[in-house]
Amino acid sequence: MAKEKFERSKPHVNVGTIGHVDHGKTTLTAAISHVLTKTYGGEAKDFAQIDNAPEERERGITINTSHIEYDTPTRHYAHVDCPGHADYVKNMITGAAQMDGAILVVASTDGPMPQTREHILLSRQVGVPFIIVFMNKCDMVDDEELLELVEMEVRELLSEYDFPGDDLPVIQGSALKALEGEPEWEAKILELAEALDSYIPEPERAIDGAFILPIEDVFSISGRGTVVTGRVERGIVKVGDEVEIVGIKDTTKTTCTGVEMFRKLLDEGRAGENCGVLLRGTKRDEVERGQVLAQPGSITPHTQFESEVYVLSKEEGGRHTPFFKGYRPQFYFRTTDVTGTIELPEGVEMVMPGDNIKMVVTLICPIAMDEGLRFAIREGGRTVGAGVVAKIIA
């Protein structure tokens, strides 16, 4: 069967469902698919198709995730749903499914539960920028006051983790009833879709961001100077642009005097392209793999940060034994490994394979980083963990 042409005309937004086990995340995902395809066309996915999430591997970590797509009149959405709590943790930490916004599902029969809190905390740590709340199973609650109470509780919980709890949209509905085709509950799903459209801003495309290129290789070309190669992560670099070399050593400034791709000279290199950038007056030994080339002032080097980390289980090829404070692995950022030490939260003596944990990392040399940067934890080239920079300390 021929693949359908990907519709490029509408803005593309990535979302996902989060929340406590059995609160109805997958049912809601199916309901959104059902109601939006019924209203705006497309192909609906049913509960069983979504629930039977295929296994994926991201950086050697096994994650079960379901991907579905749906449209509103103005946007195209890619939506991820995970069957198990561990899958959410891994998904959010590895950034396997980057979310521009999340739909937090809370059963109004239960109110916020332990995983509700944990998913909100994870969203904060990994930088999910926007959360919309869907209060599910409202058909099972007769008492208006009880619904108000649950809504208040959820809003307070979100505020506790620095989300705008008082202002974000909360929709009260029933995923199951909408899936069964009851008009009053289907209307709530359309209300949720409108909230997605209006509350989650259009994500910035990679090409519109500040230029950054993680350096993979350095060559010296006689008579021309030094060329660094790598894939442009975001932004555009043009011939004549001033750039900074950031990380590992002191930051230096230079000028891009040429861009080449597949041995051809270009005027610019754009996000997603593998290219070589010729640097004016830079010596071969002044720049190395692991540094980044960036728009001046857009990124700074750091050595200490708070992170959220998932430790691979033995089955995923991770460690077979726990680690303790004083653990000194390598932290792999973009293109290079840097040794670092860890500080565990108070009261935590050891970390078991398969755990997720908040830890403070101190690197032996600075790396160009922003909050939200992903990294791997390695021992002798073998990945034993995945993490994300939650907060820069120094």
Swiss-Prot record:
G5: region residues: 174-176
Major enzyme class: hydrolase
Catalysis performed (reactions): GTP + H2O = GDP + phosphate + H(+)
Occurrences of domain tr-type G (ranges): 10-204
Start and end residues of each stretch annotated as G1: 19-26
Region of interest (G4), ranges: 136-139
Annotated segments matching region G3: 81-84
Binding residues for Mg(2+): 26
Annotated localization: Cytoplasm
G2: region residues: 60-64
Annotated Gene Ontology cellular component terms: cytosol
Subunit structure, as described in the record: Monomer.
Similarity annotation: Belongs to the TRAFAC class translation factor GTPase superfamily. Classic translation factor GTPase family. EF-Tu/EF-1A subfamily.
Main function: GTP hydrolase that promotes the GTP-dependent binding of aminoacyl-tRNA to the A-site of ribosomes during protein biosynthesis.
Protein name: Elongation factor Tu 1
Native organism: Shewanella loihica (strain ATCC BAA-1088 / PV-4)
Organismal lineage: Bacteria, Pseudomonadati, Pseudomonadota, Gammaproteobacteria, Alteromonadales
Gene it is expressed from: tuf1
